[in-house]
Design a protein with these regions (language model features):
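A membrane-interface helix-boundary motif in multi-pass transporters
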Residues: 6-22, 206-224
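Helix-to-loop junctions at the C-terminal end of transmembrane segments
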Residues: 8, 110-122, 208
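C-terminal membrane-cytosol helix-exit motif in multi-pass small-molecule transporters
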Residues: 21-40, 230-232
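Juxtamembrane intracellular "pre-TM" segments in multi-pass secondary transporters
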Residues: 35-64
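Extracytoplasmic gate region of multi-pass secondary transporters
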Residues: 61-98
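Structural signature of the two symmetry-related core transmembrane helices
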Residues: 125-140
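Intracellular juxtamembrane helix-capping segments at the cytosolic ends
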Residues: 164-177
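A late C-terminal transmembrane helix in Major Facilitator Superfamily
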Residues: 181-210
């Protein structure tokens, strides 16, 4: 992000897309050197295939998919509009990239120290905490009087809520879904989250175009409160 912001500020924005294309080519070259993994198609696997999607009938799983739909949609929307909010508050593009860089470091610290709290609290408690963090973050963005408040909020809260929810997702899915279906269940949630991101990006764009980014953040805070209620 830091490099992309520097490119946008000091060179041509088109150079960003060229760099992404080069990175993609390098990734493809790297994968060419890996070994293929062979999968065996046994009769036992075929017999179990019919039960692979039985989790779709589990009420707890369906509820979690809905909760994830709300959370991921707002989280992705925040990733798009929080840098724009900082620019509206007067920050240059390069400084915005620096803030995003350090907020990612905070995310890494949450991951590294997750062992201290992930097994000490229930999934519901952790999920409520993630929603509470997002509500506080969105309300602070919506009411930020200057860039300083928004920057501090971004550094402290931007990555914590989303990272925490991602870790909770795996914990809860493993608790409500049979072991053989965990990967499929996570895949369904991932697809749902992708649809949520597309829908929320469109709705968010319409709302910002007709009102303001601050109104958008008030709306997202309301959706996160709805998610908290569903979690209860």
């Amino acid at each position: 992000v830091q490099v992309a912001c520097a490119m946008m500020e000091f060179t041509s924005p088109q150079l960003i897309f060229v760099s992404v294309s080069v990175s993609a080519v390098l990734a493809i070259v790297g994968f060419l050197g890996t070994d293929d993994i062979s999968f065996t198609d046994t009769e036992a696997a075929k017999a179990a295939a019919g039960k692979q999607f039985s989790f779709l009938c589990a009420p707890m799983y369906i509820l979690f998919v809905i909760i994830g739909f709300v959370f991921s949609g707002c989280s992705n929307l925040n990733m798009t509009y929080s840098p724009i909010l900082l620019q509206e508050l007067g920050m240059p593009t390069g400084a915005v990239g620096t803030v995003l860089f350090f907020s990612t470091i905070v995310e890494l610290s949450v991951i590294l120290f997750s062992y201290k709290f992930m097994d000490r609290f229930s999934g519901r408690t952790l999920m409520l905490l993630a929603f509470a963090i997002m509500v506080a973050q969105f309300l602070l963005y919506a009411t930020a009087p200057n860039a300083f408040v928004a920057v501090v909020t971004m550094l402290v809260l931007r990555a914590i809520g989303s990272t925490l929810f991602g870790m909770i997702l795996l914990k809860i899915v493993r608790g409500v879904v049979q072991v053989r279906s965990v990967s499929t269940a996570l895949g369904v949630i991932s697809a749902t989250d992708a649809m949520s991101a597309i829908l929320m990006q469109n709705l968010g764009g319409i709302l910002v175009e007709n009102t303001s980014i601050r109104i958008l953040y008030f709306a997202m805070a309301g959706l996160m409160m709805l998610g908290m209620i569903l979690t209860l």
